[in-house]
Amino acid sequence: QLALAALEVGEGALHRPDAPQRLALWREALREHLRRLFMDSPRLLGQGRTPCMPLLVACPGLQPELQYASLALQAWLEQHVLGMPMSPWLQGCQKNPGAWLLQWVHESPTVPAQLLLGAMPMGGALQCTWPVLELDDGGAVLKQLSVHMRADDAFTSRPHLGGRCLETGCWSRAGAVPVHDVWTRLAMRIAEVTFLAQDTQGKRLQAGAWSLGAGESIAWCETARGVLVHWLQVDGQGRIERYSVLAPTEWNFHPQGAVAQLVRALPELVAPHAV
């Protein structure tokens, strides 16, 4: 929708999502994080019998009419995720995220905190200082991607930028927060959920589209998994002629990317039977 709308505003113009689109993006990112925390994390971190589904089903964040800054959602997160009031938790995370997250998982009795505590030995040992996909305000990075997507249909299966494999995720929106290992990446899901719960206007996640001329446009949005890019080209009658999607997964699971490098490092960190 954003990419098509951008075609109507003229070449070189930036089109931003409207209020309903921003709300939909915010809801979906928040819910995706909650599902991953309470559905996937217990199984993947070796706690498959943890009774998480009843908690998730009762979460106000899954209600169809969820609105920004929901007090019910904030109270639920304080009880079942943070184990403490939200404001001091956020203050601690913003002041010294590394030290705060370590202190929090050792003190909080909540399921997410205890799962992270159990993942610390392995996750902390898996170091990853991979370059991240960063989008500039002028759209230069997106325009570079559009050149590749136009020239090569296979580009989206093995993307690169300037010959480099990049990664993207909620940790790549962390700004000055140092994210150098797998454990901190897992913990950033908690921080992201908390920041999203306090968002009052849907400004936490960025999205937009650029009109590139000649019936071509490129759109992006920040999702729970990272930056999602859509590129399209229409013919003279306005019908979609070519269309490509560049998902966060393609960056993160590139054969020479961050996950592949971490998997190669596993035999050095754990016994062969554990791998």
Model-predicted regions and their roles:
Residues Q1-R225, W251-V275:
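Active-site bordering "gate/hinge" segments
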Residues L228-A247:
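Short beta-strand elements
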